[in-house]
Amino acid sequence: MRFVNESAKTVMECTYDYMGRRHTRKVSVNGTVSSYLRYMYRGYLQIAAIDAVSGAFRWFLFWDPTQPEAARPLAIRKDGTWYAYGWDLTKNVTEIFGKAGYLRTVYTYTPYGEVAAEGDVTQPIQWSSEYNDEELGLVYYNYRHLNPHDGRWISRDPI
């Protein structure tokens, strides 16, 4: 699948596996590849992103093992450091905590999920504990994207 943001001159190309999960995500800006990730899953839970060129882990997610389905992420390991998530009752990530419980990033949202972050830790899981495709301004819900600007899905629900 290919997404194009003409105003930002950004192209995102994704491949999917036989279960419909996103397998790779390559982002190019002005024709130069800026990010090329390969994803790992536990069932349908995205648990890690690996740099497809170097093979290095970009991040690793720890989900609540007591939940049968994806509920909320508990922590993320990024750049060799663990960070803990704080969320509200609708599963939106609202805070990222660093070592010793220090608040590192705070997230606020519009009613449909446009995000504003204040802090120094960037990470992909945000609105509704789903993946934020920052380059496109869309929220990835495993099978389709939500446009948080107007609260609409960009495609039909796959059957």
Task: List each language-model region with its residue ranges.
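Short, solvent-exposed loop/turn segments that connect beta-strands within catalytic domains
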Residues: E6-K9, N30-S34, V53-A56, T66-A70, ...
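Short non-domain terminal segments
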Residues: M1, R58-F60, I125
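Intrinsic-disorder/low-complexity regions
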Residues: V4, Y16, V29, I50, ...
